Amino acid sequence: MWQEFKKFAVRGNVIDLAVGVIIGGAFGKIVSSLVNDIIMPLVGLILGGIDFSGLSWKVGEAEVKYGAFLQTVVDFLVIAFSIFLFVKLLNNLHERIKKQEETKQTAPTMTKEQQLLTEIRDLLKQQKETP
């Protein structure tokens, strides 16, 4: 059982996933800071000095914090757009590599007969040109 776990844990996919989760968590914090500390204050300033983090409704004793929800929605949209751009970049790179491989494969290769005939032709041209 321990050997199976070690084999599983050291596989490339699991390590890639772990790295992705760690980077994703750090990226999420960066985006949250971007939204909370830069984007939303600028949007609030444009809309007349509104602080979105403090917007809420009181319903009886409950407090509906729709301002925090709006910030979370903007946070999500920024992350989703960033992921979209990253995936689009990867797809473009993949397509470019695929096209390069296709052009390499479709490049005409000469058979031995064609190579020999080409050499004979070139030799005949040389003999014809020299007196």
From Swiss-Prot:
InterPro entries: Mechanosensitive_channel_CS, MS_channel, MSC/AndL, MscL_channel. GO terms for cellular component: plasma membrane. Keywords: Cell membrane, Ion channel, Ion transport, Membrane, Transmembrane, Transmembrane helix, Transport. It is found in: Cell membrane. The keyword Lipid biosynthesis does not apply. SUPFAM superfamilies: Gated mechanosensitive channel. It is a multi-pass membrane protein. Pfam families: MscL. The chain crosses the membrane at residues 8-28, 30-50, 67-87. The keyword Flavoprotein does not apply. GO terms for molecular function: mechanosensitive monoatomic ion channel activity. Homopentamer. Channel that opens in response to stretch forces in the membrane lipid bilayer. May participate in the regulation of osmotic pressure changes within the cell. Belongs to the MscL family. This is Large-conductance mechanosensitive channel. It comes from Anoxybacillus flavithermus (strain DSM 21510 / WK1). The gene is mscL.
